[in-house]
Amino acid sequence: MANNSPALTGNSQPQHQAAAAVTQQQQQCGGGGGATKPAVSGKQGNVLPLWGNEKTMNLNPMILTNILSSPYFKVQLYELKTYHEVVDEIYFKVTHVEPWEKGSRKTAGQTGMCGGVRGVGTGGIVSTAFCLLYKLFTLKLTRKQVMGLITHTDSPYIRALGFMYIRYTQPPTDLWDWFESFLDDEEDLDVKAGGGCVMTIGEMLRSFLTKLEWFSTLFPRIPVPVQKNIDQQIKTRPRKIKKDGKEGIEEIDRHVERRRSRSPRRSLSPRRSPRRSRSRSHHREGHGSSSFDRELEREKERQRLEREAKEREKERRRSRSIDRGLDRRRSRSRERHRSRSRSRDRKGDRRDRDREREKENERGRRRDRDYDKERGSDRERDRERSRERSKEQRSRGDGEEKKHKEDKEDRRHRDDKKESKKKHSRSRSRERKHRSRSRNAGKRSRSRSKDKSSRHKNESKEKANKRSRSGSQGRTGSVEKRKREHSPSREKSRKRSRSQDRSHKREHNDSKDQSDRQDHQSSQSGEPESQEKEHKSKDETV
């Protein structure tokens, strides 16, 4: 009930000039029926408020999901953008107002309006009527558009969908104000899929107000106080019984005249009523039976003419509907042809543009290919040059490396030869030096021993001579001794011995220096064999 509060203030008594005209027509109809309630005057806005869920239109979820998933709603109705296009679609496509198409729901032999199932129960193929009803809801109709639906004169199904739109979207407190002036509407329509359930607009509206069920779905619930109020008001408005005889014919004629008028504002054409004829006939009864018979014949003739006029009117209506359908189809075909021609022209222009673009793209691609080819050829040339250079450099480098290796090997052979020669020369020099040293050492030892022995002998001799001659000779012996000692032979021998000692010392020092140098070189070169040989030679010398 929270959703009802904003709608109650803004939409208390909806009315329209067309509805007022319809009520005036019903009031003008004579005989039997109760008087309709006049429309309440008042200003109301054109914006029509919605009641309940503003996204689902208060439809059953199963029906709504089938509507949204149907290809008819997604493809064909999506192209319809205006109110008039949807109304034309209703005129050509709707043949019943049941939510499901015939034979699409399996109710397992259940009978009745709902098939023994409350709500939806089982799904099926949703009808075009409910798809178009939800399409109207997506357009957010105004008050004027809704009144145009419920007062439409071309098809009763347009009016039926308008009333169903009101039942689903308007507050329950406003339903009586919407439906009151149409409760006695006698226009027939077949509401069941496949036919077989003909009812009038008034009967359909009474079922909308008193019952929640509509075939295999449910309308939005009406609050209990509002429902009681509606029931009481319906009791005060009983159904009109169809009249027999001339008055029934007159009622049908007036209904036809009302249907004939496109807008409800048009005044009804004045016709001769059967009441007037009856009053005139009673007034003329006193003149005789002949006048009464004449009057009766005239009345029969008038009824026959009226029937013929009705048949003509029906034929005209059929021809008009056919002509309208043809005109609409022709206009649509013309529009389609124009749109197709325009689309063809546009497509031709687009094709030309696309061709030009493709040509330009091809030119650009050719240029790019040529440029790429040139760049590729240049790159290949550069690569070949670089390869040749690298090959030359590699060949040069290989030759240089070979030469360098050969030079290194030659140097190594030379160094090895030199070292071997040096080793042989060193070994020979060492052997020679060793031999010379050994010889010199023998000579020195021999010379030293000889000198010592000679000196010892000389000293012993001198001592003996001194002892023997000390007493006899005296000073002469001493002088001679001095002379002998200072003789040149003695001095020469002494000098020789001293020079030999000096030379022997020098040779010994030279040999030591050479041996030290050789040891130093051998330690630096790291040759263990030479070191062992030198050690052996040193040991031998030692």
Curated annotation (Swiss-Prot):
Chief localisation class: nucleus
Domain of life: Eukaryota
UniProt keyword tRNA processing, yes or no: no
Chain segments annotated as coiled-coil in the UniProt record: 293-322
Region (Disordered): 1-41, 233-542
Subcellular location: Nucleus
GO cellular component, one term: spliceosomal complex
Polar residues bias (residue ranges): 1-12
Cytoplasm recorded as keyword: no
Sequence positions bearing N6-acetyllysine: K228
Keywords carried by this UniProt record: Acetylation, Coiled coil, mRNA processing, mRNA splicing, Nucleus, Phosphoprotein, Spliceosome
Biased composition (Low complexity): 13-28
Residues recorded as bearing N-acetylalanine in the entry: A2
Entry's Gene Ontology BP terms: mRNA processing; RNA splicing
Residue stretches of biased makeup (Basic residues): 257-285, 329-345, 420-447
InterPro entries the UniProt entry points to: PRP38
Basic and acidic residues bias locations: 244-256, 292-328, 346-419, 448-465, 478-491, 498-520, 530-542
Positions bearing Phosphoserine: S5, S289, S291, S319, S321, S445, S470, S472, S478, S523, S525, S530
PANTHER family noted in UniProt: PRE-MRNA-SPLICING FACTOR 38A-RELATED
Family designation: Belongs to the PRP38 family.
Role played: May be required for pre-mRNA splicing.
Protein name, as recorded: Pre-mRNA-splicing factor 38B
Lineage: Eukaryota, Metazoa, Chordata, Craniata, Vertebrata
